[in-house]
UniProtKB/Swiss-Prot annotation:
<dbReference type="GO" id="GO:0034628">
    <property type="term" value="P:'de novo' NAD biosynthetic process from L-aspartate"/>
</dbReference>
<keyword id="KW-0808">Transferase</keyword>
<dbReference type="GO" id="GO:0005829">
    <property type="term" value="C:cytosol"/>
</dbReference>
<feature type="binding site">
    <location>
        <position position="25"/>
    </location>
    <ligand>
        <name>iminosuccinate</name>
    </ligand>
</feature>
<dbReference type="Pfam" id="PF02445">
    <property type="entry name" value="NadA"/>
</dbReference>
<comment type="similarity">
    <text>Belongs to the quinolinate synthase family. Type 2 subfamily.</text>
</comment>
<keyword id="KW-0411">Iron-sulfur</keyword>
<feature type="binding site">
    <location>
        <position position="158"/>
    </location>
    <ligand>
        <name>[4Fe-4S] cluster</name>
    </ligand>
</feature>
<keyword id="KW-0408">Iron</keyword>
<protein>
    <recommendedName>
        <fullName>Quinolinate synthase</fullName>
        <ecNumber>2.5.1.72</ecNumber>
    </recommendedName>
</protein>
<feature type="binding site">
    <location>
        <position position="8"/>
    </location>
    <ligand>
        <name>iminosuccinate</name>
    </ligand>
</feature>
<feature type="binding site">
    <location>
        <begin position="184"/>
        <end position="186"/>
    </location>
    <ligand>
        <name>iminosuccinate</name>
    </ligand>
</feature>
<feature type="binding site">
    <location>
        <position position="201"/>
    </location>
    <ligand>
        <name>iminosuccinate</name>
    </ligand>
</feature>
<keyword id="KW-0662">Pyridine nucleotide biosynthesis</keyword>
<dbReference type="GO" id="GO:0046872">
    <property type="term" value="F:metal ion binding"/>
</dbReference>
<feature type="binding site">
    <location>
        <position position="113"/>
    </location>
    <ligand>
        <name>iminosuccinate</name>
    </ligand>
</feature>
<feature type="binding site">
    <location>
        <position position="70"/>
    </location>
    <ligand>
        <name>[4Fe-4S] cluster</name>
    </ligand>
</feature>
Length: 292
């Protein structure tokens, strides 16, 4: 059986080293469209595996550990978005990739942190309901001032990125005055304002490569530091609290187990209703159409 392993930039080093492809959510979605393998192992969290399954409905998609979930994605239910949308009938719904398949099915288009601004800019509607990350919504609003970006739900955020404060960043910058400051747009807007560069995980890696950065203070989950150090030689300083426990649930041993298994146990197999697959595929493909 031919197997292909995808891993997100936040995964443990041993998992990244076992992967055929490592990237951010956008890169993994693009990769998933081109995979020609019997089994795809998605090393990340639940919503990532659902996107891979939607783009590969006839392939076996499995995860190393079914408990790897995203707290931000779990905060919003499809019913809540459906009800909120009724209150704003003239608004388009842009759903961040960090959502369940059921929530994606209620949207007009999906986006990732790498292309959120581009997706929102490309829509004809003046009002945009943006779910579920309020910090990313604020970042988009800043860069698309001619549209009204309505964040939903209230206080939706990634707890890891939201925990990074301006004082945290100032302290690290005072200790490393020669370092460039790079952060993820899931961070609060006031933190983004302090950065030399704001971007998705792979955009941050590309920045280090392009700018030949010798040292960075990095405001995102610490797993990215391994890839940057390995591929660019950049010294990476990360706040100690920026660790996502869900992203660390997968281990090299668990990946090895699903690679060796002739039959993967049911909890590790990603299954979606055919109608849901069609709806998720539609919003993902709409994203590709708007940003091609």
């Amino acid at each position: 059986m031919e197997t292909f392993v995808l891993a997100h930039n936040y995964q443990r080093p041993d998992v990244q080293l076992m992967a055929d492809s490592v990237g951010d959510s956008l890169e993994l979605a693009l990769e998933a469209r081109e995979i020609d393998a019997d089994r795809i192992v998605m090393c990340g969290v639940d919503f990532m595996a659902e996107v891979v399954k939607a783009l590969n409905p006839d392939r076996e998609v499995v995860v190393p550990d079914h408990r790897a979930a995203c707290g931000m994605a779990m905060r919003l239910r499809a019913k809540e978005l459906r009800e909120f949308r009724r209150e704003h009938p003239d608004a388009a719904v842009v759903v961040y990739v960090n959502t369940s398949a059921e929530v994606k099915a209620e949207a007009d288009v999906m986006c990732t942190s790498a292309n959120a601004v581009e997706v929102v800019s490309s829509l004809p509607e003046d009002k945009i309901i943006f779910v579920p990350d309020g910090n990313l919504a604020a970042w988009v609003q800043k860069h698309v001032p001619d549209k009204e970006v309505i964040p939903f739900p209230e206080h939706g955020c990634c707890p890891v990125h939201h925990s990074l404060s301006p004082s945290d960043l100032r302290e690290l910058c005072s200790q490393h005055p020669d370092a460039a400051v790079v952060v993820h747009p899931e961070c609060p807007l006031e933190v983004c304002a302090m950065a030399d560069f704001v971007g998705s995980t792979s955009q941050i890696r590309q920045y280090c490569e392009k700018e030949d950065a010798s040292k960075i203070v990095m405001g995102t989950e610490e797993g990215l530091a391994f890839r940057i150090r390995r591929e660019t030689g950049t010294e990476v300083i990360v706040p100690g609290h920026m660790v996502c426990p869900d992203m660390k649930i997968n281990t090299g041993e668990k990946v090895e187990r699903v690679l060796e298994a002739r039959h993967v146990p049911e909890p590790l197999r990603v299954e979606l209703d055919p109608d849901l697959i069609s709806q998720v595929e539609e919003v993902v493909e709409e994203m590709f159409r708007l940003t091609r």
